[in-house]
Amino acid sequence: FSLAIRRANGEASRERVLDAAAQIAGERGYEGTSINLISERSGLPPSSIYWHFENKDELIAAVIDHSFEQWRGLTPIPHDTVAADRDEALTTSMRRAGRAIADANDFLRLGLMLALERRPEEAAGRARFLAIRQATRDELETYHRKVFGGDLDDRGLDLVGRLAMAVADGLFIAREIDDEGVDIEEAMELMGVALAVIADHLRARAERTG
């Protein structure tokens, strides 16, 4: 019984550390985040933080994983459920993604900040964020392959996937700048319409060029 309590307490303290680190890193970036600040925000001594994480680099990488799992729970890529109508599938999935971006943004805020930082030695958190993005793009390509069928070749699938993620990034940043001026759900739904038009254009161009 006492072991179970210790484990529960350990998990609870780890969650407090991760939440505090996510808040501070989102406010100050990687360089502005310190163990002392995390200690103050979480109410836990530095020794407790080091018990869970070897150093700040490892902690920030864990924050990326933790915030991604929370975000991903809200926006699963629908591998197996593709609407019969292509355009409906695109607008529905893009609107769902927009809702998730609007509702859970710690992962993207911190991840994009890390991605934009240039350091002599790459931070583990940045590497983790980029790896997650690549895995997400691969899953998105699998979904688009089902949605578009044989309409797009590999290059076309890669292009629409990159466009979808680039628009999501841009809308997120725009919402961070002006949270009253951007309806991410509506904008992402419109991007679904745009992707359908783009796919038709790419297919027609491929047919013309043979």
Tell me what each language-model feature is:
Residues T81-A84, E121-A123, R133-V160, D179, ...:
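Hydrophobic alpha-helical bundle segments that form small-molecule/ligand-binding pockets
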Residues D103-A127:
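Amphipathic alpha-helical segments used for helix-helix packing
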